[in-house]
Structures are given as C-alpha cells and as structure tokens.
Amino acid sequence: LPYTGVPFGMNFYAPQTTDQKGSWWFHPEDRTFQGYRVTHQPSPWMGDFSHLLMTPVSGSLSELSLFHAQSSYRPEESLFSPVEINLTQLRYQITSQLIPSMYGGILTIDYQQKDNHLLLTLPGRYQVKQLDDHQVAVKVINYSGCEDPDFSFYFVLHFEQPLTKWFAPSSGED
C-alpha cells in the first residue's frame, strides 16, 4: 500500500481505488481514484483503526455517492512516496498533492473548473459541525479490532478559502 505519513504520526494517507473489497481498498493496477483515505492505524489484515475518505470533485454530481464521485487516474503518472502523494483526477482535471505531518497533513488541490467541492465519505457513525467560515469538525466511529464500541476518531478540517456552503450540524450512520 502506498502509505504517506511520518514515523510515529497520528494519521496515514493513501489513495483509495475501490470500496468493494473490504480492507483491501487499494490495488496498484486499478485506474479508479475514489479519494484520499485518512486512517489512524492502517492494516489491510485487521482493517483500519478508524478512517474517512476525502474526494476532490468539480461540477454537479447526479447522486451524492462515492460511485458517482470517483474518477479515473493514471498510477504511472502519479507520485506515491512516504512524504507525498501527487496525482491527477482525469474526470475533473484536478491535480492534488497531499503532504503528511505529525498530527495531520496538507492537501493542496488545483481545480481547473468551477463549482468545486471536497466530498467527505464518513462510514459508520459520525457527527459533523462547522466551527467557522474556515473549519469543520468531524467525529467518526468506524473502528476495526477494538473492544470499545464508542472508540472515536476526531479531526478538524481547516480550509484556506472560506467555505461557500454552510454546514448545519449533522450526525448519522452510514
């Protein structure tokens, strides 16, 4: 798996190419990009110790689903290294770069079209709350291999540009 992260970091990142194969959500020969998977403790054998998916998209989607948001990409033209992921989504003409840090990471997205979005896929139980014009706080409960049924993964997304759509506090279960 092409994990990007820092030694002893709190999170790791990888491209997700399928959501149909359980813990085996990346294959090097797949040409489908579903988004950047953020995971606290990755393991294809036992599953993630909590995860979520961030998918850059442009334009409108016929349905708000991962299937309708995914794009093709060329793995041979992408960069997968321990310190960076860089790839181009062909459907949306989006080039993005993800660089990890100890507690988070920086996702730089170069959109070429208008009406741009970042789709969050939050499997399991979740809560979302917009903190201000630049920040969204999320709690996800979708652990694997944990005795605590309420083991939670907390994170805050900070955006350089102000959010154009206000998020009402929401919670649910996927």
Language model segments and positions:
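Accessory carbohydrate-recognition regions in carbohydrate-active enzymes
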Residues: 1-174
